[in-house]
């Protein structure tokens, strides 16, 4: 077996009111964000008792991965580490070292390229290995999976379920809107270039086709920072207003940029955008994210199997496909899969 462990690597989130501000300070360290701005964002978490859904979802996902491994008759210890909150990646890698793990696959809970979606996870891996010191396991970050058949299937199915929740008299006229986390235009230009935005656009087309939609919109959400800095647009709030002005009576929002119910989903969409839509007379349904779906667990293990040499990469073919990085080793920059495979098996 190529790997003797799997590390689920994620963003992290607070699990109590007293953890919210320290968590936000971790997230924004070195960026000079005013404390009053952090206090404003903290209110979003405090609305939910100071608990982000993300850690609980990831623990449930790990349970599904372990169950799937059991169904396959495989034994592979699964570890959990975060960038910004307990359990930290440094502690997870140190635990793997202490347990005698020599090489682990790393499944990041982000399907995309770009800095915060990919490169920063490589930095997390390097930081975790440095903390573990001598004897740290080799860590192989698995590839981008924005075009994996199971991801496309889960989102397409969730759109159909969301559509059925709309009132029958407006269901057939509902506008499908895909949304992902906005980033500064300059940041998108630097990576790829435009790797993140191209991948989101391509995945949007794949999911829309799988769900049976020929017309749809793709927008961005949750921007922050000074207004003078351009971010990817259009913003979902502006777009919902524009839809209302065009007479749209119902909207299905698919948060394709999120593999789980981050606070940006349960607050920005389920609270703020839903309230805005209601004020504008628009019925809104939100498609669910993969969260801890068993198919998401299978997706993670599919990526592991690709590096074991058991199968070719699973990808949905479409028009004008977006590129995706392969695998990276020990926090290095992503490279094409064949070169990475040679590096870890040679």
Swiss-Prot record:
Q: Give the record's keywords alphabetically.
A: Cytoplasm, Heme biosynthesis, Iron, Lyase, Metal-binding, Porphyrin biosynthesis
What InterPro entries would the database entry show? Ferrochelatase, Ferrochelatase_AS, Ferrochelatase_C, Ferrochelatase_N
Q: What is its main location?
A: cytoplasm
Q: What is its EC number?
A: 4.99.1.9
Localization terms from the record? Cytoplasm
Does the UniProt entry include the keyword Plastid?
no
Residues engaged in binding Fe(2+): 181, 264
Instruction: Give the UniProt record's GO annotations in the biological process aspect.
Output: heme biosynthetic process
SUPFAM superfamilies linked: Chelatase
A GO CC term?
cytoplasm
Q: What class of enzyme is it?
A: lyase
Q: Name one Pfam family in it.
A: Ferrochelatase
Can you tell me which residues bind Fe-coproporphyrin III? 52, 121
**Per its UniProt entry, which superkingdom is the organism in?**
Bacteria
MF annotations from Gene Ontology? ferrochelatase activity; metal ion binding
Q: Would the keyword S-adenosyl-L-methionine be found if you checked this record's keyword annotation?
A: no
- What is the annotated role of this protein in its UniProt record? Involved in coproporphyrin-dependent heme b biosynthesis. Catalyzes the insertion of ferrous iron into coproporphyrin III to form Fe-coproporphyrin III.
**Family affiliation:** Belongs to the ferrochelatase family.
PANTHER family reported for this sequence? FERROCHELATASE (PTHR11108), FERROCHELATASE, MITOCHONDRIAL (PTHR11108:SF1)
Report what the protein is called: Coproporphyrin III ferrochelatase
Gene name, per UniProt, is cpfC
């Amino acid at each position: 077996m190529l790997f003797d462990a799997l590390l689920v690597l994620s963003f992290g989130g607070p699990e109590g009111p007293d953890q919210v501000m320290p968590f936000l300070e971790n997230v924004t360290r070195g960026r000079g964000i005013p404390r009053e701005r952090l206090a404003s964002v903290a209110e979003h978490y405090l609305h939910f008792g100071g608990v982000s859904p993300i850690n609980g979802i990831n623990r449930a996902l790990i349970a599904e991965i372990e169950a799937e491994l059991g169904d396959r008759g495989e034994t592979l210890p699964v570890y959990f580490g975060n960038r910004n909150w307990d359990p930290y990646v440094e502690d997870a890698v140190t635990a793997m070292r202490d347990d005698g793990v020599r090489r682990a696959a790393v499944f990041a809970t982000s399907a995309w390229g770009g800095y915060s979606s990919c490169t920063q996870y490589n930095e997390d891996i390097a930081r975790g290995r440095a903390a573990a010191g001598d004897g740290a396991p080799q860590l192989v970050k698995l590839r981008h999976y924005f075009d994996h058949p199971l991801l496309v299937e889960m989102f397409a199915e969730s759109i159909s379920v969301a559509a059925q929740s709309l009132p029958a008299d407006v269901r057939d006229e509902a506008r499908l809107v895909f949304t992902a986390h906005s980033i500064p235009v300059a940041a998108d230009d630097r990576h790829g270039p435009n790797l993140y935005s191209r991948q989101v656009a391509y995945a949007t087309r794949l999911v829309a086709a799988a769900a049976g939609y020929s017309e749809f919109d793709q927008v961005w959400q949750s921007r922050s920072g000074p207004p003078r800095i351009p971010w990817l647009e259009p913003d979902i709030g502006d777009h919902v207003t524009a839809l209302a002005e065009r007479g749209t009576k119902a909207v299905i929002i698919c948060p394709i940029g999120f593999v789980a119910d981050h606070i940006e989903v349960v607050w920005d969409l389920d609270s703020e955008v839903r309230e805005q839509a209601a004020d504008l007379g628009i019925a809104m349904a939100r498609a669910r994210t993969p969260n801890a779906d068993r198919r998401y667990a299978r997706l993670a293990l599919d990526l592991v199997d690709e590096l074991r040499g058991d199968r070719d990469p699973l990808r949905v073919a479409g028009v004008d496909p977006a590129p995706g990085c392969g695998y990276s080793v020990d926090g290095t920059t992503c490279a094409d899969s064949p070169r990475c495979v040679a590096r870890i098996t040679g």
